[in-house]
Amino acid sequence: MNHLNKLMERLGHQFNNLELLKIALTHCSSGADNNERLEFLGDSVLGFIIASELYQRRPQAREGDLSRMRASMVNGDELAQMSTKLGINEYLQLGVGEQKSGGKRRRSILADALEAIVGAIYIDAGLETCRRCVLNWYGERVDDLSKLSPKKDAKSLLQEWLQARRLPLPTYEVKITGEAHAQTFTVNCYVKGLPHKTEGVNTTRRRAEQIAAKRFLELLDDGKGDGITERDQ
């Protein structure tokens, strides 16, 4: 019995070309054919599927609200949790160093692998099969799309706060450390004319920027940072 049969059962798709699934599970640290190209494709396919569902289920929502709702459905945390729920982490192929450093628990690796699998299913069986699988993974969250509230992320709220007061837009300075497959992003956020400077650190640039923006908001007098998320948008 193929060791990937159990995973394919969880995914809801039996691959015609099993090599596609194997590549989707292979991280760039392994030194073999890896999942980066499939991840690139899967990111777009996943975004389209969720955007299409939102468009149909939220006919009154504006473009900006639709964008924020889509981002909340496909952000790194959401995808990493779904990847773990499907048991994808059990089948990942990593390099020795990445394996020892806990790569099978790394949020970015889990999210990337899920996107790569979306790309692999799309190539293997087409859009409709891919759509069926993706919507099944999301489960009840798909039914909740009609009730989903479009929350703004920290960077958007900070920009709106500054624009309302005719202040300059924030500057985000980024420093990258670590190997290519295990990078850490340190982002400093500041605004010309204001005394504050905040820092955000994460394994993705966008999330580090959100953390820095949220911390900056929390320093402002009216407490705009309360209750917002550091969503990876």
Swiss-Prot record:
Function: Digests double-stranded RNA. Involved in the processing of primary rRNA transcript to yield the immediate precursors to the large and small rRNAs (23S and 16S). Processes some mRNAs, and tRNAs when they are encoded in the rRNA operon. Processes pre-crRNA and tracrRNA of type II CRISPR loci if present in the organism.
Keyword flag Nuclease: yes
Protein name as it appears in the record: Ribonuclease 3
Phylogenetic placement of the source organism: Bacteria, Pseudomonadati, Pseudomonadota, Gammaproteobacteria, Legionellales
A molecular function GO annotation: metal ion binding
Subunit comment: Homodimer.
PANTHER family: RIBONUCLEASE 3, RIBONUCLEASE III
Family: Belongs to the ribonuclease III family.
UniProt organism field: Coxiella burnetii (strain RSA 493 / Nine Mile phase I)
Main subcellular location of this protein, as a coarse class: cytoplasm
Record-linked InterPro entries: dsRBD_dom, RNase_III, RNase_III_dom, RNase_III_sf
